[in-house]
Structures are given as C-alpha cells and as structure tokens.
Amino acid sequence: MKSIRMLMVMLALDDLLKNPYETFRIADELRRELVGDTVTYVVNRNINFTDICINDCKFCSFRNRKKYLLSLDEIKQKVEEAVEFGCTELCIQGGLLPDADLDFYLSILQAVRDVDKKIHIHAFSPMEVVHAARNSGMTVEEVLKELKKEGLGSMPGTAAEILDDSIRALICPRKLKTAEWVEVIKTAHRVGIPTTATIMYGHIDTWEHRINHLLLIKKIQQETGGITELIPLPFMSKNNELGRYAKGSSGFDDLLMIAIARILLYPEIKNIQASWVKMGQKLAQAALHVGANDLGGTLMEENISKSAGATSGEFMHPEELRELIKIAGRVPKQRDTLYNILD
C-alpha cells in the first residue's frame, strides 16, 4: 500500500513538474490560504565561530580557508553589536573542531548569556550536536538537554543537504547519515527544542531525491510538530570540489523548488523561506509569488555562502527588507525565531 501511495505521489508531482506555471499558481494559492499576504523577516546576526573542520564535504567552500577560531571575547563583542542593533536572534554555527565537546559548545552559550539574558540563541547543527556527543561520551539527548539548560532556544536544521545516503556518500561522506539526522531532529523536538529544516539542491541530486527529502521532512513534522520553517538552499558552486562537476540550479529551478516544497509540505509546514543571500534579492521577491512567505534575516555577516560565490551581500537593514517585501506586493512583518509577529 505504501508503494502504491508513493507511485501516486510521484505521478502527481511529475505532472506538476511538466506544468510549472500551474504549479506556481497552486503553490501561491496554498501560501495565501496558510499565511495570507504577510511576508516575514527576522532581525538577526549570524556568527560563524570557526572555519576549522575535520569533515570533508565536497560542496563546502568555507572549510579551513582562513583557519580562524573566534575567542569567547570576540563572540561577546559580536553579541554586544547585535544587541545594540536590535537583533532578536543569534544564529551560531561553525566547523567541527577536532576536540570540541559539550563544554566547548556550552562555553559559547555562556558567553552569549554573559552579554544578554534574553536574546534568542538559534545554534548548532545536528552534525555539531552529534560531534559534541561523541567527544563527550554522551547521548544526543543528554547533550541537547544540557544545551537547552544553558540557553539554547532552537536549532538550525542544517547538515541535511539531501537526505539520501547514496548522495551523501558522494558529497559529504563523513557527515552524519540520514537516519542520524532524523533522530537528532526528533530528539530535539522531544526535549522541547524547535528546529528549522533545510534542503540543499542543484548538484548531483534529482527531483526524485528532492521529493523524497521533502516527504521525509513532512513525516517528521506530522510526528513532532517541531519544525518552524523549511529553507531551500541552492547549491553554490564556486571554490569547492563539487562545483567542478555541478554548476548549480537555474533561477527557474529555484522557483520550482519553492513551489513544489509549498505543495508537498501543505499544510504541515506553514513557513517557507526564500534566502535572499543565496537567491539574490530579485529572485527572492519572485519566490514570494510561488509559495515563499519569509525572506530570512538581516544576518549582519555571512561567511559560508560568500565563500562559495554568493554575491548578494551579507547584511540587509530591516528597512531594506521591508521595502523589498512591499515592492513585491506583500505586507512586511518582523517576526522572532519562532514566527511570533513583533510588529
């Protein structure tokens, strides 16, 4: 029965892929039904605390480029700047330092809390959590509980790439397997830590891989309800090994990815982000008419996409984001990390 249902889904999606403009229309209708004409953004700061990493992901242009590691004082300074700017969120991630254990990640949270007790900390990918657990001789659940106790508010659902182990074996062979990623996400939800979800597409993946990935995300959400948004991430092909074989998605493909995600994830996941950093401002505006309802954050700095060739900048003032949304014919609203409206 399960295989029959999957066949029906694939046949329906094949029709959607063959009729993209109808797909765009359907996705936009579903977006309007779920969230209306509101388009959200978050005032946040990105902090990539190190580019040193023991992994060897073929799509990564960030790893070991400068071999830097921010001190806790440097992190505190960035937090102070974020608070002064009015940020409600800090997004904190980094490479995998060889000996990074739970205490290392706790020290980052403590540094943030030394500066500000209230700002929301959105930090540490599932890969970082598994890495901390391995280096500490602890379970993932134990690590997550300690991180939450120290102030972790939510987790980015990064390190997902494509949730298919045959693809992962080629593009990120040392990264956690699909089942491990799913288990970390479910465990986070179980202990009260919401997460985002991501998909990195446009390399050696096919639409079948993408669809299976989205259906897995949908299944997780049906079980836990802990996913706040989906963030589709087009592969950036500059300065990395994978870019020698794959040049990335087209703009049309990016829009179709947004639309298919909206349709497939309906109604479980309400929020789909169009990343202005990766897509560019104009394509992100277009995405607001094919299913997306969020433009992400101000960031203040962003190192990972920039190192892979992104040219859209790494900071956008809230007023610029609002104007971008208005020009696209939507209603801008500032949100927090968990999609509570702050306007």
Curated annotation (Swiss-Prot):
Binds 1 [4Fe-4S] cluster. The cluster is coordinated with 3 cysteines and an exchangeable S-adenosyl-L-methionine. It comes from the Archaea. [4Fe-4S] cluster binds at residues 53, 57, 60. Its cofactor is [4Fe-4S] cluster. The keyword Hydrolase does not apply. GO terms for molecular function: 4 iron, 4 sulfur cluster binding; 5-amino-6-(D-ribitylamino)uracil--L-tyrosine 4-hydroxyphenyl transferase activity; 7,8-didemethyl-8-hydroxy-5-deazariboflavin synthase activity; iron ion binding. Pathway: Cofactor biosynthesis; coenzyme F0 biosynthesis. It holds the Pfam family CofH_C. Belongs to the radical SAM superfamily. CofH family. This is 5-amino-6-(D-ribitylamino)uracil--L-tyrosine 4-hydroxyphenyl transferase. It comes from Archaeoglobus fulgidus (strain ATCC 49558 / DSM 4304 / JCM 9628 / NBRC 100126 / VC-16).
